[in-house]
């Protein structure tokens, strides 16, 4: 929301359209100027048409809200996971179809919670890539999803439940190409051990992929 739009005069708009689709009244968070008190936000379809100091005209629907913010971004999600303390155990009990249904539901929850962009960096069966494609086409309700699908790991490495085991430079290069071909918009590698994923044998401070494999 730019400074100019927040100061926009309402005359031209009200003359062109007799009624807005939706007007929101409340505080607006502006990325440049912080919290702006008592603004009118005009919504047409899925876009914000303008932000005004005064009510710009009649509307089919008017809602009073506490705060309108820009869409939030979450850079580390796993849509196939649930919110339990041991989501890997849940994955082991679920079929691929159940995991897909869950991921679709989680995508919808992200949008309903104000998150409009996510980066999904690890999913079984490349489910997040399929969900990302469906969201982009408008087949489901979801945010913009940048998904890696399966992650690239060494044999026995971190997150084996959705890892593509890749040993050596050529194998890693091949795995990257395969993920790109599937539609991955980001590549996730497990360069070290982690703190969750395997019951034994993991050390987050230990290198797994070599420097040559990574670069």
Q: What is the meaning of each model-derived region?
A:
Residues 12-57, 66-68:
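N-terminal metal-binding scaffold of metallo-dependent hydrolase/deaminase domains
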Residues 102-128, 142-153, 184-197:
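Divalent metal-dependent hydrolysis catalytic cores, especially in the metallo-beta-lactamase
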Residues 66-137, 212:
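Metal-associated gating/positioning segment near the N- to mid-region
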Residues 78-99, 108-111, 141, 149, ...:
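Active-site gating loops and adjacent loop-to-helix segments of metal-dependent hydrolytic enzymes
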Residues 99-107, 167-178:
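Short, acidic/polar
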Residues 130, 171-190, 195-215:
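Histidine/acidic residue-rich metal-binding segments in metalloenzymes
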Residues 26, 41, 46, 65, ...:
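Divalent metal-coordination and catalytic microenvironments
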């Amino acid at each position: 929301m730019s400074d100019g739009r927040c100061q926009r005069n309402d005359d031209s708009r009200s003359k062109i359209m007799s009624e807005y689709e939706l007007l929101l009244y409340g505080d607006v968070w502006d990325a440049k100027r912080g919290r702006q008190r008592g603004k009118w936000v005009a919504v047409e379809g899925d876009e914000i048409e303008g932000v005004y100091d005064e009510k710009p005209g009649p509307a089919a629907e008017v809602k009073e809200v506490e705060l309108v913010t820009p869409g939030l971004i979450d850079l580390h999600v796993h849509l196939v996971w649930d919110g339990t303390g041991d989501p890997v155990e849940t994955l082991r009990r679920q079929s691929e179809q159940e995991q897909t249904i869950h991921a679709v539901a989680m995508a919808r929850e992200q949008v309903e919670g104000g998150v409009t962009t996510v980066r999904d960096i690890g999913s079984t069966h490349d489910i997040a890539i399929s969900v990302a494609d469906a969201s982009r086409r408008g087949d489901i309700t979801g945010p913009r999803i940048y998904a890696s699908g399966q992650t690239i790991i060494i044999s026995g490495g971190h997150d084996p439940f959705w890892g593509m085991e890749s040993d050596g430079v050529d194998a890693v290069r091949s795995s990257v190409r395969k993920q790109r071909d599937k539609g991955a918009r980001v590549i996730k590698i497990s360069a070290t051990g982690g703190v969750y994923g395997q019951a034994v044998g993991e050390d987050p401070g230990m290198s797994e992929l070599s420097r040559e494999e990574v670069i």
